[in-house]
Amino acid sequence: MPQPDAALEPIVGRYINIESLGRKYRIFYEESGEGIPLICLHTAGTDSRQFRHVLNDPEITSKCRVIAFDMPLHGRSNPPDNWWLEKYELTTKVYTNLIHDFWLALGVENPIVMGCSMGGAVTLQVAADYQEEITGIIGLESTAFAEGRDNNFLHHPAIHGGEL
């Protein structure tokens, strides 16, 4: 017997196969809504589920086509084809090209690109590289520059001799 309060969410998930900088990727993404395309970039170590509340917000999805994808090696996205044959580094150039090639593969025009933390920081480079192709950027908990993530205090001789 079906549950009387059960309701399907409007989010639809799919895979798309794209090529970026000569490498092939199988990328998972979720989308919901109609209107202005809003590309959502997750933080390092997470995936598109980070934006599940945005994808389910009727006030947002009534105005925007919200699209959140999993970076390669995150969530349900595979690493690039033959990734073990050469060193794989997710550099700024690789990431910004992948974002651009992703929205082109979907046929998206003039998106707003929104990212959180690392995803937010890369929105600045997306804006610099593709300013004629985007509507705008939104950086959440992002920064244009951050000092190294090393905590020099941990290298003090009184604290484990700098060993973790």
Annotated model-derived regions:
Residues 1-17:
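An N-terminal hydrophobic leader/cap segment in hydrolases
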Residues 21, 25-79:
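Conserved HGGG/HGGXW glycine-rich cap/lid loop of the alpha/beta-hydrolase fold
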Residues 115, 119, 123:
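Gly/Ala-rich beta-loop-alpha elbow adjacent to hydrolase catalytic centers
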